[in-house]
Amino acid sequence: MKTKIPDAVLAAEVSRRGLVKTTAIGGLAMASSALTLPFSRIAHAVDSALPAKSDEKVIWSACTVNCGSRCPLRMHVVDGEIKYVETDDNTGDDNYDGLHQVRACLRGRSMRRRVYNPDRLKYPMKRVGARGEGKFERISWEEAYDIIATNMQRLIKEYGNESIYLNYGTGTLGGTMTRSWPPGNTLVARLMNCCGGYLNHYGDYSSAQIAEGLNYTYGGWADGNSPSDIENSKLVVLFGNNPGETRMSGGGVTYYLEQARQKSNARMIIIDPRYTDTGAGREDEWIPIRPGTDAALVNGLAYVMITENLVDQAFLDKYCVGYDEKTLPASAPKNGHYKAYILGEGPDGVAKTPEWASQITGVPADKIIKLAREIGSTKPAFISQGWGPQRHANGEIATRAISMLAILTGNVGINGGNSGAREGSYSLPFVRMPTLENPIQTSISMFMWTDAIERGPEMTALRDGVRGKDKLDVPIKMIWNYAGNCLINQHSEINRTHEILQDDKKCELIVVIDCHMTSSAKYADILLPDCTASEQMDFALDASCGNMSYVIFNDQVIKPRFECKTIYEMTSELAKRLGVEQQFTEGRTQEEWMRHLYAQSREAIPELPTFEEFRKQGIFKKRDPQGHHVAYKAFREDPQANPLTTPSGKIEIYSQALADIAATWELPEGDVIDPLPIYTPGFESYQDPLNKQYPLQLTGFHYKSRVHSTYGNVDVLKAACRQEMWINPLDAQKRGINNGDKVRIFNDRGEVHIEAKVTPRMMPGVVALGEGAWYDPDTKRVDKGGCINVLTTQRPSPLAKGNPSHTNLVQVEKV
């Protein structure tokens, strides 16, 4: 049977940058094309809204997962069952300058298949086999509550509240009542705070290194201009920034990126080891680069800019610390400034010429020179980095280096420019569920919880990044794992984690709360079935939303399936058994809490309609009154009146705080913390001697068919976007690998068997796996699901103690 292609598609004139806007029905090609279109520019020309049947209800819901977008869903319900799903096709229009529609991507539109998935958890269960075997027996809710409450009280009495840990989970990140991260904003945290607190964590698997690195540059979380501001840009440079797959919906960045470029006609340059869907013919240039070498490229660019007088000296003198000797702190060593480092006048004596950078990055020297001149002479320029470059062993320094391009050229704090960080956005002060204060001030890196189980009392502030005290007193004895797959699937070095969790004398109780039998759920001692977003009422807040912020009324669409309960019901019942019910609930049901929070939100946002009006309306939108969000605008306009939160109040190219840390912390060989944004290869780089045994760099990427591991069990998405290992034809030919061949990817940490995708869209010497595929081991622990974390390392990055998920050396062979 042949698929008939609509005449509108056949008649469309397809050009390189016009590909997307001339594709009226992008979804038709979605399953068969190598490049899935993340949005459709004229999709509103086709009326997708079918007339509702007389017995049909249309109820607003939302996709609340951790992609960087939040999208409304309109559920068509007949006799208590979801029949099909639409998105925002009746509020606003496709007008970029107005309150545009927020259309869900292929993931959100498949929500019905998540709700009715055969993997759904149906009732409470307790483990009867070894952890990881997935052997459980059904128990009642009362028994589950009693087991949890009794054992938690025992562990607190024996080890203290510091032994209770809330694991990282972002499965319901967009919710208000149901929010699953950060841990301090969850209902589990509220429960624990009523019971004496818990061991907290800092950082996150998405952005640990950039959050820490740019904190020492700008102070706090590094802000960025909204992508809508690209309408004022002349040039867009994206380092490892791939919104076309990560934030691809109408609520995300891709829409703004392309709409704004239609106004400004800005050139777009993508720097990435992999040719991503953000390009897909819309980019003007793709520059492939070796993973982990972004800082070396920036240093080569800076050399050209400095020697050819393309830097904004006035900006550097007024707003920055440490560019040259004029602004170098007195505490710094002679020639300890950035300019000296780049020109080879610093301690290493090496000039960071384009030729030097080319040897490291794989980018030709003449291309580096050309790019430096273009960036240095084109203003305003939107220079941005995604969170791929920072997810490396040298990620903190790399983020500081990339931001230097925006700093050197004076593009910070102006329309059309950016800080060098990822894009920012306008946000509304909507009130979320209060979770009280944690009496325990101790925290660890979110990435080092397995170490805290294995060697907790040995972990110190100077060696392991423990915060709040000099060292941990006790190991982790209980884990709450709510709406997250980081217990196994999303945490690095799965085989090591498996060994640690298998011993239930170490961590004595693991409680998993989830909707599906995930890889992590199989390691639970007590497994509680959660409601999906479609089975309860909540508010969903936007995330990467450009210059139009919004809130979605996520109504209850159907009754909870099987014996599933909401997280509020579960924690309220546990609070009753733990003797803190009144403190926890304050006498309110979930809906009463929502009405209470909404009333508070209306005080902060007077334009909000009444609760009942909002329930019918489904989504509330508001444009940024300033037009576009411009990061550090106030600082740029008056740095004296609006200083940054760095120690100097300025942009710190040289950081004395980092110099102090470098002098006092205990670091393993190869780890580097430096006051300047230098290049350091880090461990398992392409320069590592280990590459003789494992000659290929393995990097990950966020795949369009999943949000991390969420939606990873939806059949149609798996069929449309197969899990494959991407490999360049040159590397494949050396190994006798053809497209579609089964290959083994392996290193000392594990082995994965998966099909190969042979494509020139990969940098030679580099292979890639989409992260989030569900771990599926055989009896020899060889993974058949394509889970990259079988191969990643639990060695943390130096400063943030974050996950270096893209720093891996492997070998690949045909099976």
Which ranges hold each PLM region?
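Active-site phosphate/pyrophosphate-binding segments
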Residues: 334-335, 339-454
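Long, contiguous, secondary-structure-rich segments that constitute the structural scaffold
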Residues: 567-617, 709-711, 715-726, 730-815
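N-terminal export/assembly segments and adjacent metallocofactor-ligating motifs
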Residues: 2-310, 336, 355, 461, ...
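Long, well-ordered, tryptophan-enriched scaffold segments
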Residues: 263, 274-378
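Phosphate/diphosphate-binding loops
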Residues: 508-509, 556-575
